[in-house]
Every structure is written in C-alpha cells, then in structure tokens.
Amino acid sequence: MSASDLTSVQAGAPQGRRQILVTSALPYANGQIHIGHLVEYIQTDIWVRTMRMHGHEIYYIGADDTHGTPVMLRAEQEGVSPKQLIERVWREHKRDFDSFGVSFDNFYTTDSDENRVLSETIYLALKEAGFIAEREIEQAYDPVRQMFLPDRFIKGECPKCHAKDQYGDSCEVCGTTYQPTDLIHPYSVVSGAAPVRKTSTHYFFRLSDPRCEAFLREWVSGLAQPEATNKMREWLGEAGEAKLADWDISRDAPYFGFEIPGAPGKYFYVWLDAPVGYYASFKNLCERRGLDFDAWIRKDSTTEQYHFIGKDILYFHTLFWPAMLEFSGHRTPTNVFAHGFLTVDGAKMSKSRGTFITAQSYIDTGLNPEWLRYYFAAKLNATMEDIDLNLEDFQARVNSDLVGKYVNIASRAAGFLLKRFDGRVQASAMNHPLLATLRGAIPQIAAHYEAREYGRALRQTMELADAVNGYVDSAKPWELAKDPANAVALHETCSVSLEAFRLLSLALKPVLPRVAQGVEAFLGIAPLTWADAGMPLSPEQPVRAYQHLMTRVDPKQIDALLAANRGSLQGTAAAAEAGAANGNGAGSKNGKGAKAAAQPAASAANADDGASPIISIDDFAKIDLRIAKIVACQAVEGSDKLLQLTLDVGEERTRNVFSGIKSAYRPEQLVGKLTVMVANLAPRKMKFGLSEGMVLAASAADEKAEPGLYILEPHSGAKPGMRVK
C-alpha cells in the first residue's frame, strides 16, 4: 500500500484484512522510561489495539537502542560492561512497558545478531549502488581519554552569539547549528581537556545524490501530516538548491556498536543501526512465529509500515531512513506519524519540581496506569502539537469521566439485575433507542482512533456516557425497586444500562484494555471487537457479581508522586546534612542573618533588619540553590522594575526568570555573569510570561537610606548547575 492510499483506508470501515507493521521510536539504553516517553508508546499502543479489534494482522515492534558512546561511558562509570548495562536496562524498560499496557509483539535489542547482519546487508547494498563515500575529516579528539568526541560531548563558546558552555552541534541560546570544530575555547565533557584536532577516515551516505533528492520529493507527498510535509520541503529546498548534505554513518574506536565491514576500527553510527533495529526485532519475531520476513520488507511488498515518533527525530525518519531503504532494495514506510512534546503543569519536566516523573515511580506510588493512558489519549490528536499534563486537571478528568460517568453506570445497575432478575438482561430492552444511538456511534469512534484523533473519540464517548447517565437519572431505578409492580420497568432500565455500559467499554477498550478485561469477565462475554457493537447481551448469559473497576485519584497520591521524583532536592538535603556534620553547614558562619533577599517576579519583599527566625537544617535543605549563568537579558516592555533573564542552570534547557533589578543593572551588564538562583520555587504566571525561579540579590534593610541592589556572584570556577550548600 502506498502512502497516498492512507486517507482512503482510514475513511471508513476496514477494507479486508490488512497486514501492518508498526513501530515506536527505540528508547535509549542508558536511562529510565519517563512519562514523556510514555506519550508515544501509549499513542502507538492505542492505535495498534484499534487495528487488532478490526481483525487485521498487525505486529507492534520495539527494541532498546543500545549502541553509542553514551552507553559505553555510562557502563564505565557503573563499573560494568556495556552488555551488562544494556541487559539490565532492557529488563527495566520491559517492566515499565508491561506496567502501562504497552502491548509489543516483540521488544528486542539493537545489539543482536539479526541487527548486525541486516545493518551490514543494507550498508553493502548502498555501497554497491554508489551511495557510500569515503572521506578524510577533521574532528575533536580528547588527548586524555584518547578518543574522538561526539558532538554532544564537546562544549564551548558559540561561534555566532558567543554564549558559553554550548554543545558541539548547536547553540541553545541563539539556535545556530555548526560543526564541533567551530566552537571557541572547546573542552571535553568527558575529561575537561581541551580537544585537539585530528583527521580520520569516515564513511558517508550520499544523501546529496540527485537520486535521493528525486526520490524524497516524491515520497514526501504521501505523508499524512501537513507539518511533516512542510518541514521536509524546507529541508529539501527548491529544485536545484541541493540543500541535502551527506550523512556521516561512521564512528571511530573506542565505540560500542557494530564494526563496519572491511573497515577495521570503524563502527556504524548509532543512527544507522537503530532504525534497522525495527527490522531486526521483526525478523526475530518472524523466526519464532514462522512468518515470512522477506515478504514484509521487500520492495514490492503490499504490507503497510508505520512509524510513530517524536517530532524531534523527524529528520532521521523522513530523510535518511526512507532513502536508505529505497536504495538498498527494501520497501519504504507507508507513513510516519510524529507527536509533540509533553509539558507538566505548563512547563518542561523538571527534577527540582518533581515533574520529571519516571514510569516506575508512577507505579510505585500506586497510581493506576490506565488513568494516564486515558488522560494522554484525551489530549492527543493527529498533529504534532505539544500536550500538557496538568495534574489538577488529570485528577478532575479521571474522577469525573472514568469514575463519575463511566464505571458508575455499571455500579448503579448491576446490583438490581443480580438481586431481582438472576443477573439476566431483558431481551426486548436490547432494542431501546438509546442503544441504537450508541451502536451507531461505534464505527465513527473507531474511525477517530484509526485517524489518531483520540481526543475526538473520547469526547464523543463521554457525550454518550452523559446520555446514558441522563437516562438512568430519569428512570430512577432506585425508586422503581421500591415497588414490585415496577419490575418490568426496573428490568428494562437495568438491562439498557448494562448494554450501554458494554458499548461504552467497547469504545474505551483501546485506551483502557485492563478495565475492558474486567468488564468482559463481569459480563461473561468474549473479548470485545468492533464487530461486536451489534451483538447485544443475551438473557442466556447472566452477568457476574460486580467488582469495582476503577477508584478515584487521591490528591495525596499526586503529592507522593511529586515527592518521589524530587531527586535533586534529596541530593541537596544530603549535601546540606553532610556540610553541617563537618562544621560547614547553614548555621556555622553566616548565622547573623545577613540579608540576601531573593528577588521575586515583581519586586523584593521588605525585610526586617534584625536576625531572621532560626530554622533547622531540614528547612534549609528544602531550598535548591543553584549556580546560574545569565545567557541573555532584556528589559520587560511595560515594566519599570523588571528584567527578563534567560538562565543556564545546567539542565537540558534554559529557564526564564523575571527579576526586579532593572533599577540597578542594564541588560548588557548581566549577560555572561554567573549568579545564584532558587531552582525549586514553584513557577509563577505573570502577565509578561512564566517566571521559573528567583535570582538572589542583596540590599540594605532601609533602601532609601542605603540605596543599592547587588546580585550575588560566585567566584570564578563555579559552573551552571552547581548546588550552593
């Protein structure tokens, strides 16, 4: 099936039994699964379950992405071999995916014999077709560790805006991309040594070949997402621009990965063998199940192949990967579906705020994984828009939709049916007009899921749940039960309610698979499929005793979850206690209450010039003070007090802070300075934007008598992200 056929396939009911291969991006094998990762795996799993319910032959394939310098160095830090590290991480990742109901048909590893053979086969086919070039390149080399340094293992001064401590491939301040050799005053993140320049032979995939450009211009027209199509056209440029650059697919030893055939000491770059890992995992499954692997991947295959990814890796999946497949003689993806990023409470995930939430901590805290599946699904659509996990809304939506609207229907009807009617529904009730409405909506809900419009599917489902609850409220079965003369009406009401509950459970099954299993057991029915919409409950099959299917979210669980993920705060507390034990704690030398007033978003609070109240070491340990570098600063339009600071706090992103220090500093005076900030202060929304912390400044108690405002500056040698303790 070609990419352009997708719309016609998704428009209505399934057109015959389709053969579909589906993947999610491979998680890297040097860290934990967090809720940002789970957005993609839950999104993919819902789609896969939808297609399984249509009866299609569909395989959901995954693997750990195991190769590269970061894994090699992480293993070294832990005192284990890379293979030992990736085996342990694989078990952790598999546990997390199982906990959240991510139903891989095979979850494998890229460090496999299948992947080695397939990577070599594809490489040699590309080489035979003239798509591999060999060149001498100059790279940064760590003379201490005697290794070439990947781009992200070099930092230095941006060659364009001169911001300090920028990575070797791009500047997080001005957005410029460049080569590591372009950095000013570079240093190795591994050893701290100044890299030297050294030449080495590398191997390139010739993406600039006119054949690649011609193929990609045609292939991009089939992408389902306009945002992806537009981005690809931007990368391709106009015809004749030749914007595509060749891609370096090799790395030098020492490196954890696959050695390139015929090139001793040279290894495939991880981004070559990682996507091949999709096929390797599927090949492993095919060998175990007796499937014809070649029939699925050969160029003339009529199967479908879909990749679900984050928008940050669109470049690899829509340029390199399809071109590699096309010119090595394999089928190309039917489509690539990209999603946006996850924020928590309107901000990027943060360890200091406890919102960098790992999958395991969510489970350990006792939260139901299907709560998160439902919430993410309610926010997801077919675009690359970012989604936000608002924890208050999460609690309210789960409690209202899933408990108040959905499972409440069964709890209101099951008891009466079991007690009064032996658990058997009334046959004539199955023809009620309300049920006809629900059955008529099921195909549209299924189509929404298939089109990845999960939010629409759930909105429609909850509207139907409202209608069912309205029916129950109007019929008042609790009142009918008081008079034996109302037995027929009571039987009808309970029967309609439970059949409606079955249909709502069918609509929710891709999102809530474990709840659906409980419903199937309760009703005594076979696993639900989309075809079952028109097969109502039968009086021949009594329902069983109702068991609670879902509980409400307790606010204390959310508090516990955030507390469990404040890893940086725990580290600060431990450091503070250690300092106190050595006579260097908070109360040792500065116990006179010297005033270092934190400057909040609007203005500094007035303070007494006497000593502040005595606090315990535990109180002090709650404050996460960090060294911050001011990488940008500007006046705030409409304010005579505020400056807007962009701070590097040693995280993966910069922070935005508004500070009332405009009277003391011009913006250009502050850029490049180090200061101290409160890193775990709750973000504050202002009319100018979101302030994500406070910088510290000193002033006299009587500012009129002693004017002056002075931000705190650490001695040279301090670096962004260091804790103040």
From Swiss-Prot:
Positions annotated to bind Zn(2+): C158, C161, C171, C174
Cofactor note as given: Binds 1 zinc ion per subunit.
Binding residues for ATP: K351
PROSITE patterns named in the record: AA_TRNA_LIGASE_I, TRBD
Motif ('HIGH' region): 27-37
Pfam families: tRNA-synt_1g (PF09334), tRNA_bind (PF01588)
Cross-referenced InterPro entries: aa-tRNA-synth_I_CS (IPR001412), Anticodon_Met (IPR041872), Met-tRNA-synth_bsu_C (IPR004495), Met-tRNA_ligase_1 (IPR023458), Met-tRNA_synth (IPR014758), Methionyl/Leucyl_tRNA_Synth (IPR015413), MetRS_core (IPR033911), MetRS_Zn (IPR029038)
Gene Ontology process terms (BP): methionyl-tRNA aminoacylation
CDD domains: Anticodon_Ia_Met (cd07957), MetRS_core (cd00814), tRNA_bind_EcMetRS_like (cd02800)
Annotated transmembrane regions: none
Localization: Cytoplasm
Cofactor (UniProt): Zn(2+)
Gene3D superfamilies, per database record: HUPs (3.40.50.620), Isoleucyl-tRNA Synthetase, Domain 1 (1.10.730.10), Methionyl-tRNA synthetase, Zn-domain (2.20.28.20), Nucleic acid-binding proteins (2.40.50.140)
Record motif 'KMSKS' region, residues: 348-352
NCBIfam families: metG, metG_C_term, PRK00133.1
Function comment: Is required not only for elongation of protein synthesis but also for the initiation of all mRNA translation through initiator tRNA(fMet) aminoacylation.
HAMAP family membership: Met_tRNA_synth_type1 (MF_00098)
Full protein name: Methionine--tRNA ligase
